[in-house]
Amino acid sequence: MVLHTGALRHYDAILCVGDFQFEEIRQTEKLFGDPEQELIACGYGQLEKLYDAYQATPREARRRPKVLIAPSWQPDNILDSCIDPLLQELLGQGFDVTVRPHPEYVKRYGDRMNAIVKRYEDYKGGDLFFELDFTGNTSIFDSDTVISDWSGTAYEFVMVTERPCVFVDTPPKINNPDYEKITVPPLEFTLRDQVGVRVSPGSFAGLSEKIRALLQDESYSERIRAIREKTIANFGRSGEVGGQYLIDEIKKQVAARKQ
């Protein structure tokens, strides 16, 4: 859904995040007549780094839950379609709310972002913050929950912190219209109902109560760990797996040259 048609076509081997990508790639090869590639269930090293950093970071007790709004930057994202009614529902409800736009949104649509900030410059509730410094990601993983649309940040938050998210069902980010020709449903669709709750952009009434219920539901942690185990291959040792594959391939090439 995100990768353009042919994006992986010219690789001989692909280190996959998990088995779920195998069937997607195999169906794509057959659909477009591409040669079959070698697929290795490797894992997701960047996610492991984020997880290790999170585990090493001390967490302090806080008086009010932190809610992070972290949208994507595709058309009809949260900032362009529904940020005002969303904030209207959240502010004054006992949360500290931070709006953290995607860096690309600020880069491409700085005037829009400035207009949003300006609309709230006289707000005195003390529970609304705008984060426009993207040099770090501490605020993401220090949050109690994340509200997003189709940003990958939401899934990183879920898999790293083992906490649920709120997904706003804005129009999805579709870079590849051919995705519907593949029978495997995109992971971006299937995980939304499993690791949090979904809400319509025009239906935020009661969202504050839903968030409080999410934060009190301890079953999500175990559920998310199980999903991570099933979805992400070799969690905690992807570097070892990927490195061993490369070493083995080099040995094969060296041996072939000696023949």
What label would you give each PLM region?
Residues 1-52:
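Active-site and donor-binding regions of nucleotide-sugar-utilizing enzymes
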Residues 7, 60, 139-140:
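Structural alpha-helical scaffold elements that stabilize or flank donor/cofactor-binding regions
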Residues 8, 36, 145, 150-231:
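Catalytic binding pocket for nucleotide-activated donors in carbohydrate/polymer assembly enzymes
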Residues 12, 65, 141-144:
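Conserved acidic residues
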Residues 17, 42, 100, 168-170:
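Generic beta-sheet signal
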Residues 40, 44-119, 201-204, 215-216, ...:
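Conserved catalytic-core segment of nucleotide-activated headgroup transferases in glycan assembly
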Residues 111-155, 160:
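Donor nucleotide-activated moiety binding/catalytic core segment of transferases
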Residues 235-259:
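C-terminal alpha-helical cap of glycosyltransferases
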